[in-house]
Amino acid sequence: MYLFMISCYVMMIFNLINLFISVTMGIWNFSFLGSNHAQFSLFAILVFVLTETLVMYFFIATGKSIKIILTEQNTSDATKLWEEIKYIKKLIFPQIMLTISLIGGLYIFYFGYIISNTTNDNILQYSWVLLPLLLVSIIQHLWSLKIKNDSFKMQIDIVSKISSGS
């Protein structure tokens, strides 16, 4: 489980770096590792979706394993711990889905509509929509990283309580 969680953290850091590079490529129009903005952004969005899916899978898989252990214990403490697991899921899954929707929507709006329908001369006409959407997406993504970190900590605390038998 710890190796799985560490791989989630590594992917989240790699994902944040990719998104930062992609945004800066769009603003300053430079190539990175021989790829243009569209090519690198496609890579970044694939890493983003993979990372968010991996984090969701972590909480689903560990939650299922914890449920099996707690069901065997059948105590009031086990019920309380299961309620904490459900609270974590209610906390993290909506944040992940909102982040996926915002970043994915930004990607589709930018590359699917703006780039395909404009030239470099008139791309600024969409900045009134693009920039607020970009800011909201970045803020939401950073907020979801905090929520994920807190959720990982809570999940580990629950596993520690189960391991210690309390």
Listing of model-derived features with the role each one plays in the protein:
Residues 1-27, 98-99, 158-165:
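Alpha-helical transmembrane segments of integral membrane proteins, especially early/N-terminal helices
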Residues 27-38, 114-123:
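Membrane-interfacial hairpin junctions
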Residues 16-20, 35-64, 135-144:
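Hydrophobic alpha-helical membrane-embedded segments
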Residues 17-25, 95-120:
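Alpha-helical transmembrane segments and their membrane-interface junctions
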Residues 2-10, 80-107:
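Loop-to-transmembrane boundary segments
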